[in-house]
């Protein structure tokens, strides 16, 4: 076991917890839990104009829903601005940073010139060794790091391998803006150091930041945490992930009826593998997870695969647990609020009895809820478009005769109603399917449902006879 592992998840509260962020949080959580360490949560809210309380709540709620818990109190980066500023001033006093008085116009000119010449280095270092007495009046300076001018900056990344940057291509990055606020680069380094972070696991879009941050670590004489830059998530065609491909917030997946355990399982396999195993319990994930098994190439998001996995979790879920998930989902899924007032002890018991048949067909909680609507339906039932043309006068007459037969069943169950219907079919020279479909339409308003005899048993004799009355003709 690695001693005292501390990971962190550090989202910016400028929007929802997106699917890539959720996977990053999961990887950090799994690594910390495997090694008996801590996963800390830091909200990087220094962008005051874009950070919102609603976004913070969405991030916290999304993590809780996914079952990703964090250790210690949440750290809010903005509350540590004074500490960040002190470090910048310390570097300035030690001659490791300097005040830069370049005007916005000068900086724009430098950038254009660098791009025209094909240089990565945008700032020309003009204030690095210049006498501050030459500073223009009334211009608030930035504080820049005195980055090394030659040599290499090297990261031994746990996923990307050895990554090397030539220092001549890296300019003196800004640590403190003219208004006294710290830059992201400085704040992240100071916070990770002060929080005791030992492992930084994040998206590989941060890899260039790693070079800048290592220079700050080196200048301060602080130990660099172990870094692991994980591949981004792409769409199924290899393009940048879009909303159409799954670039949605965790809250959207909740509203689409995915189970948190299924989404966790799906996310862990995006970029990480453990042989051919696809299904993992939470403990199996923790036991097996390792940074060395994360690939370098972008993972591809596949909605169909997620849906199939979700269906597996629904089918294998305990019925009582699934009823609880069903109830919780009513607050989030489309039209869920319509059913909420109708969920009482009686309908909950019916739902529990129906669950073995319902869950076999459902790939999402939305499908599960939709297929269970017959339990909660008001009389007379509203027939769906496919059912209406099948309810002919002959069919209605048949339903009336079926109702008369079912009324004679004394001990109501799936078995007794099936026996009565089979006897009716034989006596009238009918196939069972010719009876089942009219029954299904009359009892559920649809052409598809769980097994018709399960439907009869779940609804009970009184409700079934009443619904058959509504759709029958003498």
UniProtKB/Swiss-Prot annotation:
Quote the SUPFAM superfamilies the UniProt record gives.
An anticodon-binding domain of class I aminoacyl-tRNA synthetases, Nucleotidylyl transferase
- EC number, as in UniProt: 6.1.1.17
Residue ranges spanning the membrane: these are none
Where does the record place it? Cytoplasm
This protein's source sits in the domain of life called Bacteria
The reply on keyword Protein biosynthesis is: yes
Query: Which Gene Ontology molecular-function terms are recorded?
Result: ATP binding; glutamate-tRNA ligase activity; tRNA binding; zinc ion binding
**Which reaction(s) does the protein catalyse, per the Swiss-Prot or TrEMBL entry?**
tRNA(Glu) + L-glutamate + ATP = L-glutamyl-tRNA(Glu) + AMP + diphosphate
**Gene3D superfamilies tied to this protein:** 1.10.10.350, HUPs
Q: Which Pfam families match?
A: Anticodon_2, tRNA-synt_1c
Keywords noted in UniProt: Aminoacyl-tRNA synthetase, ATP-binding, Cytoplasm, Ligase, Nucleotide-binding, Protein biosynthesis
Q: Where is this motif: 'KMSKS' region?
A: 240-244
Q: One cellular component GO annotation, for this chain's record? A: cytosol
> Which one GO biological process term can you cite for this protein?
glutamyl-tRNA aminoacylation
Record bears the keyword RNA-binding: no
Residues binding ATP = 243
Per the Swiss-Prot or TrEMBL record, what residue ranges does the short sequence motif 'HIGH' region cover?
11-21
Complexes and interactors: Monomer.
Q: PANTHER family from the xrefs?
A: GLUTAMATE--TRNA LIGASE, GLUTAMATE--TRNA LIGASE, MITOCHONDRIAL-RELATED
| HAMAP family (alphabetical) | Glu_tRNA_synth_type1
Family the UniProt entry places it in: Belongs to the class-I aminoacyl-tRNA synthetase family. Glutamate--tRNA ligase type 1 subfamily.
The task this protein performs is described as: Catalyzes the attachment of glutamate to tRNA(Glu) in a two-step reaction: glutamate is first activated by ATP to form Glu-AMP and then transferred to the acceptor end of tRNA(Glu).
Q: Please identify the protein, giving its name as recorded.
A: Glutamate--tRNA ligase
